[in-house]
């Protein structure tokens, strides 16, 4: 491609409304342009990258035995009403009425459509397992679209859905898809972790997220220093450290009128924060136990996902207000504790191994110090309630935990029969009776993958694509003052024709621009291999080569250039 015949729309300045690096660089590199809130036009440079990512995903999905289909973006409301999600999905579901007064939605996902398709096309257990996928536009009416294509309203997604006779068959396909996803993100050159995750609004049982590690990520990713263990922070199991020690002092009731928070207690009484506990009051799951106490070490944070999964706790989690707490317990939130507590208590594992600790006395303005389990108060129920912290032991017993920010680019679920049961998607089983199909689903945010790659791989000059396979062009020919030098023009034209004939995705910068502008643009869009042709070097039989990823520069003999590029460039 010649730049003179290309829509090459780079920007020198960073737009003010672009907050994250990927948004800034995608705008500056001429990959995208905003049209409305959360809606983007993809320009030629952007669409080249997007299609290359799609092709890698398609190739690996096909290798894994999945079969490509294409389903409509517009979906009839009846399918969503049948699945039960018409009322449950919320405001992100864009609904509209056609001129025949029929309700439709703009699809945020395709579980209903694929289930309807398969129940019409598949009738026997002999046709299973079946794994169908598509790459299609989705729309979610985000309340606050932000970060460019990282969280836009319209986006491209690869979504796959598998159908099975039983859970064992689903597990086999799930394992295959786990490996397929690992292969995809490895081939894309991304530093990622596959983490245990919550199933969220999609539903189902087992679930893994594929997270690209990047400081701009919205999720906390927990992983071991010495094993493959990785989990979303909401699901990472917290292991108690150490064993409970014998008491060393008598319990004391202390006046603490000005200590209404853990930090104030620690500062005023010179207590180690890890020797304090805090008591949080939440709504209970039943009328008989309308309030429940959750007890954590003073320096630990409550994991709300873990808490609301406890049978005594209301789901969704809801904290009791000050008036409810005062009426039931007789003390304000700054003086709550485990002694003489008149509501059920659940203590975190880390609290269960504490000794000589401080806690509220359930009397306003008072705390107990040197409290010990069994001696001073009976041990309540113990559960995993907290978020893990860096340095915690890994739950698999191998290494310690690290926590980094991550961008979710893929998610796989074992749906079970959530949709097939609701929509009566059955086949004739081996015994001749109707059998409800078991389902899995597997999604990759294709547009988000592009942004995540940039978040993880860039420098002050622009994008550094982690793999030649997804760069918009693999080789840039940059002729210096070509329009003033016949030899430079002749060599550049010949090299361009040769590389094109060899199938190399090459961009030839034939603009009448200063060399500095040409270099800056090629580095900005992230072309991994740059061939710089100058009159003086050419006269000496040499060509300059620059590697965008390593920053390496070297002189290559003119007659060895094609062999060098063939060895170093993945066409």
From Swiss-Prot:
GO terms for cellular component: cytosol. InterPro entries: aa-tRNA-synt_IIb, aa-tRNA-synth_II, aa-tRNA-synth_II/BPL/LPL, Anticodon-bd, Anticodon-bd_dom_sf, Pro-tRNA-ligase_IIa, Pro-tRNA-synth_IIa_bac-type, Pro-tRNA-Synthase_IIa_type1. CDD domains: ProRS-INS, ProRS_anticodon_short, ProRS_core_prok. It catalyses: tRNA(Pro) + L-proline + ATP = L-prolyl-tRNA(Pro) + AMP + diphosphate. GO terms for biological process: prolyl-tRNA aminoacylation. PROSITE patterns: AA_TRNA_LIGASE_II. Keywords: Aminoacyl-tRNA synthetase, ATP-binding, Cytoplasm, Ligase, Nucleotide-binding, Protein biosynthesis. One of its GO terms (molecular function) is proline-tRNA ligase activity. It is found in: Cytoplasm. Its EC number is 6.1.1.15. It comes from the Bacteria. Homodimer. Belongs to the class-II aminoacyl-tRNA synthetase family. ProS type 1 subfamily. Catalyzes the attachment of proline to tRNA(Pro) in a two-step reaction: proline is first activated by ATP to form Pro-AMP and then transferred to the acceptor end of tRNA(Pro). As ProRS can inadvertently accommodate and process non-cognate amino acids such as alanine and cysteine, to avoid such errors it has two additional distinct editing activities against alanine. One activity is designated as 'pretransfer' editing and involves the tRNA(Pro)-independent hydrolysis of activated Ala-AMP. Consists of three domains: the N-terminal catalytic domain, the editing domain and the C-terminal anticodon-binding domain. This is Proline--tRNA ligase. The lineage of its organism: Bacteria, Pseudomonadati, Pseudomonadota, Gammaproteobacteria, Pasteurellales.
